[in-house]
A protein has these predicted regions:
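Vicinal oxygen chelate
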Residues: 1-8, 13-21, 53, 57, 75-149, ...
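Long, contiguous binding/interaction regions
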Residues: 29, 79, 85, 136, ...
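Conserved oxyanion/phosphate-binding beta-strand-loop segments in alpha/beta enzyme cores
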Residues: 65-68
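Short, solvent-exposed loop/turn elements at beta->coil junctions and helix N-caps
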Residues: 41-44, 73-74, 115-118, 122
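Short beta-strand/turn micro-motifs at beta-sheet edges
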Residues: 2-5, 73-78
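N-terminal beta-strand motif that seeds the catalytic metal site of vicinal oxygen chelate
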Residues: 1-25, 84-89, 141-149
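Core segments of cupin and vicinal oxygen chelate
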Residues: 19-63
Length: 149
């Protein structure tokens, strides 16, 4: 595998797709509150009957996307094996993260205090469908052996 690794490297996370019950409510949260751009809003490739809304950078760069498939009839999910616990957006500094925390709380969004793992700092909120959303500082980060020194 070592010789093939240069040819077969994973370069990062491309996108995360979740399910939402109400696409308009999801747009209000991620575009209007969080400031993400809608980079696509239309039928899903997997299910032409389902609306698929993509949020991210204006140019749609891979690694900057989160999308939601609109399935209003599905029941609410539960956290468990085979489900996703949360997804995280990155900010550069603790000051930027604190500004997000203050802004979100000012908008009536329940937001945790800062949690410092030693590798990065995190705050957590829930979107209208209950997805856990983390806003994390980029550093100091992890190395192969654990948190960076």
């Amino acid at each position: 595998m070592a010789a093939e690794q240069k040819r077969m490297q994973l370069r990062g996370l491309h996108h995360v797709t979740a399910i939402c019950r109400d696409a308009e409510r999801t747009i209000a949260f991620y575009r209007d509150l969080m400031g993400l751009a809608i980079v696509h809003d239309g039928p899903s490739d997997d299910d032409a009957e389902s609306r698929h809304v993509w949020f991210g950078a204006q140019d749609g760069r891979p690694g900057n996307l989160v999308s939601f498939m609109h399935y209003p009839e599905l029941p609410s999910g539960v956290v468990g094996v085979g489900s996703t616990h949360h997804f995280a957006f990155a900010v550069e500094t603790a000051e930027e993260q604190e500004a997000w925390r203050d802004y979100l709380r000012g908008q009536g969004v329940e937001c945790t205090d800062v949690f410092d793992s030693g590798a990065f700092r995190s705050i957590y909120i829930r979107d209208p469908d209950g997805h856990i959303v983390e806003i994390a500082t980029s550093g100091p980060g992890f190395t192969a052996g654990g948190p960076s020194a």
